């Protein structure tokens, strides 16, 4: 590992963090990248200092609250100062059954090309390391226009506001409100696809388990670079400067609190906490992942659980890419589009459209599992 970057991990302001030689792989050199994905490869961590501060375990909760509130207000102001091709309506909706007294803000994005009623729905969960939520960073309006669907965007609580399960409760509240108000929103509750990138993908997959527990049955889930586990189990870690193994560790520690890396919490916290049995009856999934994402091996493990549970699952891994480089410029606005990123964007769009067009759910798997259980153990 390059000396300067290795020392950066062990510097004084990262107290109690030790990165031992041979345990971290330095991937900051663009040579690691696919030739069409080397732009936006290494970002000086100093440019990301506000984000890192919000999940730095050495920073007080009071400091995080002050910085996070200021930063979030700027993001929302940025949204409203942007030119829009869709209308955006904001609602405050009741809390979910597990936290009924806590309202959640929900945005409803409506393009001009939707039908008067019974529209498809893109339930889009914005990413941002669970410490920031910037709808401008993702092409939500573009996706709604291209797929002729209504966008539902939960403005969930961030980890410096409330720890797990607050964000999942908010996503649950938004989904329940959407289904309960389907006619008013001119949507079809049986044609809802969840999606999100990074922590948005993590929350989309985790929300899938919450919805399954409550009897909801979304059409599918399409994610990009989702985090699936907070337990570091396999091999050395990667260092890229922004949302690498160090950043992900601190970000998930901030979100999970005392439940961090604990087997006492299930897949509604982190999807790969699921057992194979938990995955039976899970919605169809399309996962897009970078080869050098910090928890790529955990994500592959989660994918194999879906296969063992006979859920519809498709997994795309892109070589020469890490969490935030230009490979995903079309999907989540990182860098400038190139041939490789346009191909990724096309596959992503195809997966969304497949969820809308085809019913890929497998209800018979649940029935066969129940029958087999009954045959083996009786009533």
Walk through the language-model features, giving the residues of each.
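An N-terminal hydrophobic leader/cap segment in hydrolases
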Residues: 33-94
């Amino acid at each position: 590992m390059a000396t300067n970057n290795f020392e950066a991990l062990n510097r004084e302001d990262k107290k109690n963090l030790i990165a031992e030689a041979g345990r971290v792989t330095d991937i900051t050199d663009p040579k690691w990248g696919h030739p069409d994905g080397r732009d936006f490869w290494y970002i000086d961590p100093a440019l990301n200092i506000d984000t890192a501060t919000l999940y730095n375990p050495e920073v007080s909760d009071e400091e995080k609250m002050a910085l996070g509130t200021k930063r979030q207000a700027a993001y929302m102001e940025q949204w409203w100062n942007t030119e829009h091709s869709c209308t955006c309506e904001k609602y405050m909706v009741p809390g979910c059954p597990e936290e009924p007294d806590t309202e959640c803000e929900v945005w409803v994005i409506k393009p001009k090309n939707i039908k008067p009623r019974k529209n498809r729905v893109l339930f889009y969960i914005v990413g941002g390391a669970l410490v920031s939520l910037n709808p401008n960073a993702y092409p939500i309006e573009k996706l709604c226009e291209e797929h002729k669907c209504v966008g539902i965007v939960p403005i969930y609580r961030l980890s410096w506001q409330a720890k797990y399960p607050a964000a999942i409760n908010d996503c649950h509240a938004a989904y329940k409100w959407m289904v309960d108000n389907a006619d008013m929103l001119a949507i079809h509750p049986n044609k809802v696809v969840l999606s999100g990138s990074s922590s948005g993908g993590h929350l989309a997959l985790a929300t899938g388990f919450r919805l399954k527990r409550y009897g909801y049955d979304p059409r599918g889930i399409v994610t990009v670079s989702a985090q699936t586990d907070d337990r570091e189990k396999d091999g050395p870690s990667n260092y890229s400067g922004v949302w690498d193994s160090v950043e992900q560790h601190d970000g998930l520690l901030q979100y999970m609190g005392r439940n961090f890396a604990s087997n006492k919490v299930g897949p509604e916290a982190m999807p790969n906490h699921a057992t194979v049995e938990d995955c039976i009856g899970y919605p169809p999934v399309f996962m897009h992942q970078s080869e050098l994402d910090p928890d790529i091996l955990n994500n592959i493990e989660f994918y194999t659980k879906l296969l063992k549970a006979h859920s519809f699952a498709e997994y795309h891994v892109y070589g020469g890419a890490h969490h935030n480089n230009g490979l995903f410029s079309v999907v989540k606005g990182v860098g400038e589009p190139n041939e490789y990123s346009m191909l990724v964007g096309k596959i992503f769009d195809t997966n969304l459209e497949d969820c809308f067009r085809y019913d890929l759910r497998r209800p018979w798997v649940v029935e066969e599992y129940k029958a087999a259980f009954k045959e083996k153990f009786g009533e």
